[in-house]
Amino acid sequence: MKSIIIASLVALAIAASPALDRTFSPKSEYVYKFDGLLLSGLPTASSDASQTLISCRTRLQAVDDRYIHLQLTDIQYSASHIPQSEQWPKIESLEQRELSDEFKELLELPFRAQIRNGLISEIQFSSEDAEWSKNAKRSILNLFSLRKSAPVDEMNQDQKDMESDKDSLFFNVHEKTMEGDCEVAYTIVQEGEKTIYTKSVNFDKCITRPETAYGLRFGSECKECEKEGQFVKPQTVYTYTFKNEKLQESEVHSVYTLNVNGQEVVKSETRAKVTFVEESKINREIKKVSGPKEEIVYSMENEKLIEQFYQQGDKAEVNPFKAIEMEQKVEQLQEIFRQIQEHEQNTPETVHLIARAVRMFRMCTIEELKKVHTTIYTKAEKKVQLVIETTLAVAGTKNTIQHLIHHFEKKSITPLRAAELLKSVQETLYPSEHIADLLIQLAQSPLSEKYEPLRQSAWLAAGSVVRGFASKTQDLPLIRPASRQTKEKYVRVFMQHFRNADSTYEKVLALKTLGNAGIDLSVYELVQIIQDPRQPLSIRTEAVDALRLLKDVMPRKIQKVLLPVYKNRQNKPELRMAALWRMMHTIPEEPVLAHIVSQMENESNQHVAAFTYNVLRQFYKSTNPCYQQLAVRCSKILLFTRYQPQEQMLSTYSQLPLFNSEWLSGVQFDFATIFEKNAFLPKEVQASFETVFGGNWNKYFAQVGFSQQNFEQVILKTLEKLSLYGKQSDELRSRRVQSGIQMLQEIVKKMNIRPRVQQTDSQNAHAVFYLRYKEMDYIVLPIDMETIDTLVEKYVRNGEFDIKSLLTFLTNDSKFELHRALFFYEAERRIPTTIGMPLTISGKMPTILSINGKVSIELEKLGARLVLDIVPTVATTHVTEMRFWYPVIEQGVKSLQSARLHTPLRFESTVELKKNTLEITHKFVVPENKKTTVSVHTRPVAFIRVPKNQDSEYVEAEEKTISHSQYQMSTEEIDRQYETFGLRINAQGNVLSQWTLPMVLMTEQDFEYTLENKNRPVEFTARVTIGNLEKTDLSEIKFDKIFEKEFDLENNESENRRQYFHKMIREIQSEQGFKNLITLKLEAPQQMYWNTELRTVCDKWIRMCKVEMDARRSPMEHENKEWTLRTELLAARPQMPSSLRQLREQPHREVQLAFNAKWGSSKKSEITVNAQLEQSTEQKKFIRNIEREYKGIPEYELLIKAARLNQVNVVSEYKLTPQSEYTFSRIFDLIKAYNFWTVSEKRVQNENRRVVLQLSVEPLSRQYMNMTIQTPEQEVELKNVRIPRVVLPTIARSAMFQQTWEKTGATCKVDQSEVSTFDNVIYRAPLTTCYSLVAKDCSEQPRFAVLAKKINKNSEELLVKVVRREEEIVVKKSDDKFLVKVDGKKVNPTELEQYNIEILGDNLIVIRLPQGEVRFDGYTVKTNMPSVASQNQLCGLCGNNDGERDNEFMTADNYETEDVEEFHRSYLLKNEECEVENDRISEKKNYRNKWNREEKKSDYESSSDYESNYDEKETEKELVKKTLIKEFSNRVCFSIEPVSECRRGLESEKTSNKKIRFTCMPRHSKNARRFLKEAREQTVAELVDFPVSFVESVKIPTACVAY
């Protein structure tokens, strides 16, 4: 009964299946003709292409409703290079190719398929069939696989409604085709008796695709770029034609293209179709096959076997290259290297041979490689041996690497050479566990223990190889991803290396190896190191850097780890900055950026805050397409911050992005420095270069870096050792130093100061230079105490340099020969095609470099000579290729760009010290009978290669150069010959007149430049002589006509100024002067020369100078006389005032310049220029408006600003040749065009051949410029031109030192009641008649101390004591004069210079310190220190200068307190000479910390009377000048003079009323619109000339506070 029921159900199921879904009737045989076409060429119909036509008859027997049996017969194929056409080529137009019997038998083997719902669900092949043959048969079955209707459960209501109307139907469904399991879109159209089914494949929605990719693991993920980069996904369309429910024809068309900059450059195309021939009953059954069931999807089994062989070597189960006999491989390699040896010079053909050798080596077993070694390598010349070594390393298979390591251990390859070869192994295309294990064994071998470069290269290479199979990259290998156990294995190995390391370098190397590996599981180990405070800082920083390759794998995890590190102020600043730097490359989201900005705004360490701001700002400005989202987020987040960094911060990050967003291509240069207060050297310096080409992002294409920890200790120790031979003979100075040290020690004892000992170990101090290439650490160069000691011991004997050893090393003649073959890059991608052949898209750049030469150094008594004789030869070819492969045929298209350079060179350099001169000579020699060649060749090539049937001898491909006809017409022939300097130069070729990169790739071009010398050697000589300074008379300097009418001052002061000027010149001329002569002679063959003399005459203080330059050269083309140039420059600067009073009273405050030049050959041009560097009208008003009397430090700081010269007046008279006049005119036109929007001009009639120029810079912001130029015919005015912030010159005495301290130093101010520390913490603390320690070097070997006290209880005047290691200096002000005592003895003002003391003006004295200086005006002590000096080794009321605001109050015995009184008392020096004012000290109102760490606010106000609106430094901190705007309905009013406002981020704390004048103008007027725009960024200076509309009282802030 059960069997009856089952049979009934089966019958019902069969009956229910619609006949429409049955393509073939059971028990019938169908014959179809199959045609397949391969086309490779350019994406244009007008060029030739390589085309292969394959045809056969297909017998198809429908056994039942589900199974069909198939067999191919009458197989033939033809291939040729013919023009492209939309039609199928006729078989007669192609060359018939012979198919071997072996291949024909394979293709004729039967196969069986199961059909379900019209689709091929299972396939069975003969057990004797080959994989490539199976894929060919799949392509035919692929044409019979068709779903005639949408699955009912997937049809929506509209489709169901349309089902009733068969005229048209569309549906999407996932379906397995030859190219993968992807979404397919069906369209069904009824045309009479015919039904046409069309389906297209959507490759964006694939579940699986049989594809591989190698060599892409060095790229980074760029989400904003096209995911496939240059490769465009294939376009595949199927068309099925049914007539009366029978399949008449089925065709598939696929196109594969490569895009560059959005344009197709090469393409490959496949077409396949089956055409119905006949239908009949089955007469002769096709043999049923019973092989394993397989899918219709392309089988990558053959590719998998190849990959396994590359990765596992002889341990692979199957050798896919076994068919090629050993003798045949050796013969091919022998022929390759024979041809390379015959090529004396490297050519593109040599590069092609190297690429072939690499391909052959990848096919070799260990035995075959041994045969190559004994047969070829041992008998070859050195060049071929070196090339064989590098090609084996580039091949990068397990067998080639094992073979190389075997010879490393036998030392037949030197360890240094082995280390070099391992750099190529790092880039292997086929990384595997087997290769990684080999490298780790090498790194741990006794050989590597002896040779550090080899060991380092082995570890770094092992890490890079591990990344290839154990980390997520863009590679798509066929082997399964590494298991967790495998990852844990290598993490354990690398961490064991770290734990076993004894030195810092060893630990750094272990972490760089782990960083190269990029294993996700390593993050847990790295986090432990980063968070372990017991680890050295350099190790923790290196662990942060080791996370770099995980940015795409686990960005959120890295952010979670590094954000707390960055925010934790207990961590060192350089660690925090490194964490931020690494975190930003994970492209954080806005919440993370908000945390970063919040930390920046509340940051107490200014280095960290400034670095953070710069990083955010640079990412916000980036045009890198891969940072687009991050740039948007950074721009949003920066809108809400008020933080502005200090200008002098050295820790910074900057980038230079150069990108084309349309092409998704460009480059970016990054530069970052990380400084710390305790070091003069940067803790970290990085310079990197990253690229994006066609959306492919190489984040760390190249990077060089330097990191160090306490390396200053190494330098100091080394200098101490080198100074052993220096004998000190000055006993007096020695006694003075001992006296100073004793006084410093007494201060330490009396104040109970605990020395600030830096926790640094000089033995652990180290520095590391590293090179990173393609995201891999490539080279690590450590420098530590041991390395320095080795060098010192080698070249220093008994405290003196061992000159003999050094001379022996330098004077040895050194011949060298270098040959290196390498692939700059190699990438490969393989995808299936609908014709059953794999399509390989590859790019590579094989290169060979050879350098033969000799270098020698000859040392003489007073000179040295270097001779370098080399012949470099470079050849390289960039290959972009699309290739189809079958055992019977290989076809494709490639674009080649080749370059070659061969240039013999000889260079000689001599340095000789003669009696009165230093002579340096450089000589460049072009050898005789030698040719220099530079050639470039580009061409697209279509190729076909058909192997011979009899043997596997290598057959050259049949190539045909193809080109884009339209682009080719744009090329032009070049054939030019020159003869110059006795050298024959030939330039010839065929190049594009206008080109783009796609045009270059699609056209044939060639260009060759040759330089040949058939006569004697041609020498080019440059000789520089520098004479000694000689005394001379200054009377020869004449300032005759130097003042022009345009230089006259207002108020008729010009005559007085001129008299003052000439009197000053006469006084200077009465003094002794000095002169110097420098000559430069350039000599070339054929009496070509350029000789220059530069003569300088100046006084001792460089107040007046005369510079003359004479030049002459040999006549050039169209010249019949020697060309000469004679110039003279006179310069005189005014006296440098040291007080405002001197500045006001000084009649002459300008710098005068006079310049004359005369040049030409037969006709001479002459120009005379008088220039005056002066103060503008606004700047002079500023000086006149200084109504209050300033003294001391504020006076000097104001003097620097008041003495700025911000305007230059130039008057030029000229007599020019027409050619010179035209050149100057064009330059002038360019300047006007560049500043089109800010220029105005009018026609005038001025004096002929005379030009007047006035240029003035706005003195406050120094970012805007006005310029007026008057020519004989026009007056041109440029207003408000924005320029980079400039440093204006100032004539104030010693101004340069002060400005340097302001920009790069740290400053502390102390007066009788308030202290502003080095770290900008302001607090109140009263000084008494007992000394308070202002600042002191509190290291174990102190060098200075600065103390201050009140002269008496009721006085505001102070007395300052400076103790240096040499002496004790006491300074006080008495009767407006400074009284200076050194070691208790009064010193006259004329003797102060020998004690490094200087008096500026009447109210300021400067005392130099070993590092820094002290400025004192009687009331305020200002101590300037370098911003990177003595972190945690300074103490005193001025703090520790460590950049942190949170730890200023460290008492004398080195513990932190929040009680300012306790802090102050700890630095009181109590003795019998003073009376402690306990009442004043204990009174709490005298203490106030204006930087509260908990509330993070700055509410201090300036208590000094002299801090004016013109004090730029304080203005930048608190107040800024702005034009006040009042807006009404129809008018806008502007304040005529600038009004003070609190800078952004601050609020007014105190205000005062001031009457302000306003001028009003209509809102619609041009001036109103312009002034509104200018007032947003600067003060509007032009308003002074407008009438006053009204006066109004306005509240002006006098002090600001930040909340």
Curated annotation (Swiss-Prot):
Gene3D superfamilies: Lipovitellin, beta-sheet shell regions, chain A (2.30.230.10), Lipovitellin-phosvitin complex, chain A, domain 4 (2.20.80.10), Vitellinogen, superhelical (1.25.10.20). Disruption phenotype: Simultaneous RNAi-mediated knockdown of vitellogenins vit-1, vit-2, vit-3, vit-4 and vit-5 increases life span, causes accumulation of neutral lipid and an increase in lgg-1 foci in the proximal intestine; however, does not affect fertility or pharyngeal pumping rates. Expression of transcription factors pha-4 and daf-16 are increased. Keywords: Disulfide bond, Secreted, Signal, Storage protein. Expressed in the intestine of adult hermaphrodites. One of its GO terms (molecular function) is lipid transporter activity. Its main location: secreted. Vitellogenin 5 undergoes little if any processing before being packaged into yolk platelets. It is found in: Secreted. SMART domains: DUF1943, LPD_N, VWD. Residues 1306-1475 form the VWFD domain. Precursor of the egg-yolk proteins that are sources of nutrients during embryonic development. Together with other vitellogenins, may play a role in modulating life-span, acting via induction of autophagy and lysosomal lipolysis. This is Vitellogenin-5. It comes from Caenorhabditis elegans.
